[in-house]
Amino acid sequence: MLGDGNEGMSTLPGLNQIQFEGFCRFIDRGLPEGLFKFPKIEDTDQEIEFQLFVETYQLLEPLINEKDAVYESLTYSAELYVSAGLIWKSSRDIQEQTIFVGNIPLMNSLGTSIVNGIYRIVINQILQSPGIYYRSELDPSGISVYTGTIISDWGGRLELEIDRKARIWARVSRKQKISILVLSSAMGSNLSEILENVCYPEIFVSFLNDKDKKKIGSKENAILEFYRQFACVGGDPVFSESLCKELQKKFFQQRCELGRIGRRNMNQKLNLDIPQNNTFLLPRDILTAADHLIGMKFGMGILDDINHLKNKRIRSVADLLQDQFGLALVRLENMVRGTICGAIRHKLIPTPQNLVTSTPLTTTYESFFGLHPLSQVLDQTNPLTQIVHGRKLSYLGPGGLTGRTASFRIRDIHPSHYGRICPIDTSEGINVGLIGSLAIHARIGSWGSIESPFYEISERSKRIRMLYLSPSRDEYYMVATGNSLALNRDIQEEQTVPARYRQEFLTIAWEQVHLRSIFPFQYFSIGASLIPFIEHNDANRALMSSNMQRQAVPLSQSEKCIVGTGLERQVALDSGVSAIAEHEGNIIYTNTDRIFLFGNGDTLSIPLTIYQRSNKNTCMHQKPQVRRGKCIKKGQILADGAATVDGELALGKNVLVAYMPWEGYNSEDAVLINERLVYEDIYTSFHIRKYEIQTHMTSYGSERITNKIPHLEAHLLRNLDKNGIVILGSWVETGDILVGKLTPQMAKESSYSPEDRLLRAILGIQVSTSKETCLKLPTGGRGRVIDVRWIQKKGGSSYNPETIRIYILQKREIKVGDKVAGRHGNKGIVSKILSRQDMPYLQDGRPVDMVFNPLGVPSRMNVGQIFECSLGLAGGMLERHYRITPFDERYEQEASRKLVFSELYEASKQTSNPWIFEPEYPGKSKIFDGRTGNSFKQPAIMGKPYILKLIHQVDDKIHGRSSGHYALVTQQPLRGRAKQGGQRVGEMEVWALEGFGVAHILQEMLTYKSDHIKTRQEVLGTTIIGGTIPKPTDAPESFRLLVRELRSLAMELNHFLVSEKNFRIHRKEA
């Protein structure tokens, strides 16, 4: 569909616009539509009627702001009020009241919702669009079988197929098929109407005998025959109203409701003129679809490409919220109907307010945001992550595909994705190709299709007009890519340009072009658009880079990149992490947590985010960037947020890197780093962890928060205040008590001390006992307490426990085991931190900061990192920043290389450092060994790329276990750091040990130390004292488990021990 034309050049749309438009569509259209569908409800005697007066519904603004909702773990929602009336039919009296229907979670300025204090976001889902699709398959004998699949709005399917005898069937399941004549008659058509409305009546008459004519002689007979075949019922069922209701519920409602989009698709595909408001499948649809199926069999018509985006629709946040709203209203209807009947039965006088409660709507939305697979916790690792999360497209979820069953063809890139879905950005692993990302300029149309903008090329008009095309329309135009400069009207000579037409790529004269792309980034997502020189990288590495940029941790001292693409400012602006001036005025005062702005005669106080925890435990913090007395304009940046500098995205650091081997410490993607990165806090990041504890009412009394905890050392309680809560600002170590809590419990007589027994015997005093259930700081949690929150829910009952939350700030320098990465998929683990004097150094004496392995470049084909590295060196010397759009080879051949070499040459001239650009090996330089002072044999590439520190840090992953819990069934150590699990000796580890012939070590690891219950208890003592581990006489537990599993299959397995002396077989029971 062609969108409205916009004259002039295009601008980058708001990156959160997809979420905003969806939520506004729900509020403006979905909410009233759902309320208008609410039926009138009558009691059983039909004396009282309840109805909603939808015209006067109201949505009230929330009573709390977003910050308080997060602080108190509440939902940021609006209250929905609707006028309702009770009508007594006998007297025609009306009682009208405004009722509170429930709370609807609102969307904030970031495109997210706050539910129970947690930022959540709803993902857009890609589903098969309702309508009819024709395909051809080969049967076992090699003959083509043509089928037409009708997909309903609910996802139900009805297949029409034609067999060898030209008989047409409607298949309702794999084993059940029904004659199309029976189906059409059951839907209300008689035989004469069927034959009048089809193009090939002779085919329909050919397989109709006298018995079949009797079956469809009347509508009742057709319904009975349809029910007999559909439900596989034997005998002669009797026509009744309940039988029709069962068919309506099990078949017609699931498979025949097309919806608004399905009706439009059916009309277009079958050339029908049925009104749009008729959203159910009609006999005319069935018969016309059968005519098309017959035409397909005889070579007329085109089969459908099921993976084309014109056959898909986007289930946006508006559709999901509207579905949940309809579900809540159905529950409300059932509740009102039951309440009215109960009130009449007990002879009570109901009122509208008594009949309606807010529970159905509120609980429906809370369960949706908390449990639905498409409602996810917002990833707040960095500003880029927040934006990209809201632009994801998923084939998974209810009604969609699964990672186990999706085929390769569905996951693959399709030509219709051009300018709509990024061909680069997708998840890695089992969901590859099933979770994608919207292209930058793409938008979701009113019919659920993804539209992409193009410039119209017209010889008649000199004006540039921008059109938004849906996937079903752009294949009829010659579309030139935005990489070509031959579309300039000033170029008179005839030139050929690459173009796309009907999913094929052609080379045509530029006069034949109808449309052209508007931007080189048009077909990329945000993550891929931030990769400089992406055209020089392999697509797999570009995919890794776009994913790893979302894992970058905000650093304490952010720095914007020397080499970028120009989108960094837009991403930082739309992420909402920076403070933006909403009015113009003058700055009158600034401090760390607030900015005061005087404008329009008022003084505005703008609060700043100070050390706030994100959902990924990173630190969100804003730093003022304006000074007192400065004049500010509307839209100007007042404060930078996490990972932003001067309003631009700043995820990493520009560091000096050399590509060369160094003593094997950077082999296999390992990275050697300079100690300067540690001591100067180059890659230092802050992380905030949340620890919470609740107080409950037990059967022996309520739990108490106190600082008087018996049987604990005073050293562990040193940070508690008089209330038993850790003091704000204190430094805590592993094992320290954060909150002191005692839980009452029943004491046994044997547990009393002699003093307690004496008090009970003499004075009759009942000594209360309690168990220590304090909140202790777990391993790896050391840091500074920056916030303490004591949340007391209203009511104070046992069902609303008090919650105490402790927030601890950790300062993490880069260390061995941390993961670092560039923007080209070049990732590695820090293997060694070398002193500055031992690091390789350049000809001007500067030691490099990192040493990468040069072998990681050619095999991975991500040469873009070399261009960025060299250009970053030139920019660092010249104090310049570069913003380069991709595919700059459209200007001339080797444009990237020429740009890099020219900047290196200029840097060497201006700084009088000829080693920066040496004609014999441009981009390389001689590097000296810091330990000996001698130069390395070969010159190496060195420069200043942009390197990120990722959230995969060794502090979160390192784990050790001496002994711990074992699985109950296999008696093997548990798996995972969270469960204090043990090491896994897998196949490859066994192969490595087998290669060295260490049979005894293998036996110990696989049996004695793992799942042999008796022997593993003796291993520790034997290891300490010395000696050999005694050989067990029975089998390990995993072998015993295997024996029992085989016994469950009626197979008996015995094992035997062979004596070395006489080789006699002694039978041992397993």
From Swiss-Prot:
GO molecular function annotations of the record: DNA binding; DNA-directed RNA polymerase activity; ribonucleoside binding
Coiled-coil zones: none
Gene Ontology cellular-component terms listed: chloroplast; DNA-directed RNA polymerase complex; mitochondrion
Class of this enzyme: transferase
EC number: 2.7.7.6
Stored Gene3D superfamilies: 2.40.50.100, 2.40.50.150, 3.90.1100.10, DNA-directed RNA polymerase, beta subunit, external 1 domain, DNA-directed RNA polymerase, subunit 2, domain 6, RNA polymerase alpha subunit dimerisation domain, RNA polymerase Rpb2, domain 2
UniProt keyword list: Chloroplast, DNA-directed RNA polymerase, Nucleotidyltransferase, Plastid, Transcription, Transferase
NCBIfam families, per database record: PRK00405.1
Subunit structure, as described in the record: In plastids the minimal PEP RNA polymerase catalytic core is composed of four subunits: alpha, beta, beta', and beta''. When a (nuclear-encoded) sigma factor is associated with the core the holoenzyme is formed, which can initiate transcription.
Protein name: DNA-directed RNA polymerase subunit beta
Organismal lineage: Eukaryota, Viridiplantae, Streptophyta, Embryophyta, Tracheophyta
